[in-house]
């Protein structure tokens, strides 16, 4: 019988946990025997998830003040342009999936209203686009990008339910090829964007269960998925229960009509929660309301006073009015200073949404008033970017693989007379 897909034994799993530096400082509230029992007799290979996780982990654990930064993408082609331009990771936010890329086909606010398998679907779409670009580049002998299939960090939201929902969602993320996932400590049924009001926290222990479930799914799948814990305690004013003694110092005693408890928000509960999450998370993210380096520093120092090697993440959010808070020179060095504090993964959650919407509005505004002049201005900027910065999508037929599939056709039939790119307007007007 073939050994392909053979599951690991409990002894092999335990040895990996005990000897692999990847798991230094990580706590699991389950045993290797339990993981082995859950595997089944055949384990699928998750090449993209494993490879991406390893690349991401290597990037965020490099020595010094370096960091990896990413932009939120909501389409495959946006991710391709990010990698072509030089970024080394892609971020996928639930907000953008809710707004314009979910499987229901509707536009939603960031309140977990869309089908739960939507984010894994977009992860798969982005990976497919990156794989296609890699294939195109390889057939053309284009080595300008050293790694097309970069890690994708995807939004698990509040898990869309309890621990079992988290487990299944994490499995779907891994199958789609996500390198990392993040999970927030809000009540899933009341989930809100981190920059909206009305957020309801869950007890600290309940979120530890979420993180434990996400890790378990990765262990069963045999992938070193990067698990990121997010806390919304800086702004949230409600919590479901007073059952966890770690939350009790922040509970005011007041109740709402729904039965929720009022809590004191701010830096202190964020640090307390982060310390509780640290043994279960590879990275920790505190959602904030402004781009505040001093707040970030206090958070990092508070967490690292007990967990000195804890890696951190930071949302450089479009919900901040950056120029209203910081001068140009402060903005220019913002990410570098965060990196020095230990914020090793930094991302702009809604970059794709803003780029897509403003880009089309700007073109349409000009087109409505100037006709073809507006589009030709765009095309000329594309030509200039192609000449000076390596932009390739001005050759749109080539960008989506017309030449690549021509090569497949001529491999099957060297005498094929029906190839697509040869004789096209693109070949005649753009390939010179």
Curated annotation (Swiss-Prot):
Its cofactor is Mg(2+). It comes from Corynebacterium glutamicum (strain ATCC 13032 / DSM 20300 / JCM 1318 / BCRC 11384 / CCUG 27702 / LMG 3730 / NBRC 12168 / NCIMB 10025 / NRRL B-2784 / 534). CDD domains: ICL_PEPM. Optimum temperature is 40 degrees Celsius. Above 45 degrees Celsius, the enzyme is denaturated. One of its GO terms (biological process) is tricarboxylic acid cycle. The gene is aceA. Belongs to the isocitrate lyase/PEP mutase superfamily. Isocitrate lyase family. One of its GO terms (molecular function) is isocitrate lyase activity. Substrate binds at residues 93-95, 194-195, 230, 315-319, 349. Mg(2+) binds at residue 155. Inhibited by 3-phosphoglycerate, 6-phosphogluconate, phosphoenolpyruvate (PEP), fructose 1,6-bisphosphate, glycolate, oxalate, and itaconate. Its EC number is 4.1.3.1. Transmembrane segments: none annotated. Induction: Activated by RamA and repressed by RamB. The active site is at residue 193. Pathway: Carbohydrate metabolism; glyoxylate cycle; (S)-malate from isocitrate: step 1/2. The keyword Coiled coil does not apply. It comes from the Bacteria. Optimum pH is 7.3. Divalent metal cations. Mn(2+) or Co(2+) can be used. Homotetramer. Residues 11-22 have a biased composition (Polar residues). This is Isocitrate lyase. Disruption phenotype: Cells lacking this gene are unable to grow on acetate as carbon source. Residues 1-24 are annotated as: Disordered. It catalyses: D-threo-isocitrate = glyoxylate + succinate. Involved in the metabolic adaptation in response to environmental changes. Catalyzes the reversible formation of succinate and glyoxylate from isocitrate, a key step of the glyoxylate cycle, which operates as an anaplerotic route for replenishing the tricarboxylic acid cycle during growth on fatty acid substrates.
